[in-house]
Amino acid sequence: MSTESALSYAALILADAEVEITSEKLLALVTKANVEVEGIWADLFAKALEGKDLKEFFFNFSAAPAAAAAGGAAGGGAAAEEAAEEEKEEEAKEESDDDMGFGLFD
């Protein structure tokens, strides 16, 4: 098992038990699982997760894509119209370039 995976699982276990995530607790869990991890990695994970609620992160993460999909479906028609207008403007600009006499084989 990789260091990152072991520490991630240990952090999730601590968060599920509603225990503060510290480097000492991360190392204790990882060593009980017979995974060798350097102390600096546990310190980095503990500092990165300090003050963050992992449960809230996962609950908000699962709800966000559903809300974005619902909002995108409602406004899809307007976006298609804007794209069509932009294409028409680009075609008009390309045609006007031909009239300037800058052709390659003129």
Swiss-Prot record:
Residues 82-100 have a biased composition (Acidic residues). Keywords: Cytoplasm, Ribonucleoprotein, Ribosomal protein. Disulfide bonds: none annotated. CDD domains: Ribosomal_P1. One of its GO terms (molecular function) is ribonucleoprotein complex binding. Its main location: cytoplasm. Phosphorylated. InterPro entries: P1/P2_N_sf, Ribosomal_P1/P2. One of its GO terms (biological process) is translation. The keyword Transmembrane does not apply. Residues 74-106 are annotated as: Disordered. It is found in: Cytoplasm. GO terms for cellular component: cytosolic large ribosomal subunit; ribosome. Component of the ribosome, a large ribonucleoprotein complex responsible for the synthesis of proteins in the cell. The small ribosomal subunit (SSU) binds messenger RNAs (mRNAs) and translates the encoded message by selecting cognate aminoacyl-transfer RNA (tRNA) molecules. The large subunit (LSU) contains the ribosomal catalytic site termed the peptidyl transferase center (PTC), which catalyzes the formation of peptide bonds, thereby polymerizing the amino acids delivered by tRNAs into a polypeptide chain. Component of the large ribosomal subunit (LSU). Mature ribosomes consist of a small (40S) and a large (60S) subunit. The 40S subunit contains about 32 different proteins and 1 molecule of RNA (18S). The 60S subunit contains 45 different proteins and 3 molecules of RNA (25S, 5.8S and 5S). The 5 acidic ribosomal P-proteins form the stalk structure of the 60S subunit. They are organized as a pentameric complex in which uL10/P0 interacts with 2 heterodimers, P1A-P2B and P1B-P2A. Belongs to the eukaryotic ribosomal protein P1/P2 family. HAMAP family: Ribosomal_L12_arch. This is Large ribosomal subunit protein P1A. It comes from Candida albicans (strain SC5314 / ATCC MYA-2876) (Yeast). The gene is RPP1A.
